[in-house]
Amino acid sequence: MASLPATAFDQGALRAALRRARRITDRHAAALTRLDAVLGDGDHGDNLSIGFQAVDELLDELPLETRPGDLLRAVGHRLVATVGGASGPLYGTAFIEAGFQAGDADALDPALIADMLQAAAAGLSRRGRCSVGDKTILDTLQPAVDTFKAAIDSGANAQDAWAAAVAAARAGMRSTVPLVARRGLALRLGERSVGHLDPGAASCFLLLVALAHP
């Protein structure tokens, strides 16, 4: 399976990744909602599907020459406006912070992508007041971010770094099953949240797959 270009990721590649995010959230909406019916209010998949449909429409509205950073910030604001529940502000913040980190770059090299991912994770953590181990999106995102950066710092290209990051994200997602929820609606379940996959961790994994794989 092919991955991101080994050198740079321009706005065309970013648009393609975001359109994949719409397709993958549509495809898995029912499964995400089933997960959320156990730990949340049973609408996570539907909300994300609506949000990324709105992102798809945004991509048709924005000029093709829109820089990646501006594009990501616009996506973040659209997600905040259209995704219900806690996930809209969380994912929206992640995209907005990544966009700010991108600055006015016309193309995103692997080192810049690593910095953008870290900014996204830090922003999400601040907005959600969550840490790794709280049974949230961050349990998937932070291991992926750390693994991507470590791979790039060791000299790997983006393709290999993304492959490693997706593997780390999958492991992080699965790590939420035995955890007790410490944030969100699942917090009210206490020990009863053990044994269930966190829906936000699952959707984060899917979005990282969309970014990494055509």
Give, region by region, the residue ranges found by the protein language model.
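N-terminal loops that bind phosphate or other acidic moieties
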Residues: 1-214
